[in-house]
């Protein structure tokens, strides 16, 4: 299967998210490490730099995902953020 090429970097929450997404998307994928992004100045600087031309934020629809999106919105200009949402699935 050919991977979908995406030019903008994608921000996801964890390693599993990155691993899964890497299976079908050809893009730069950065993990937040969950809430560790709040204190990781190096990762924040990387995300700021990558976000200069735009960035895709793909987080869970739960409370944690919302907090991470809100935090990223505070460090990247809002016109550079493309939020994608993973819906909650109830079984």
Predicted regions and their residues:
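TOPRIM fold recognition
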Residues: 4, 23, 29, 37-91
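N-terminal G-site helix/loop of the GST-like fold
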Residues: 12-29
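Conserved Lys-Pro-Asp/Glu-containing loop-to-beta segment of HAD-superfamily phosphomonoesterases
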Residues: 9-12, 57
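A short, flexible N-terminal coil/short beta segment enriched in small residues
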Residues: 1-10
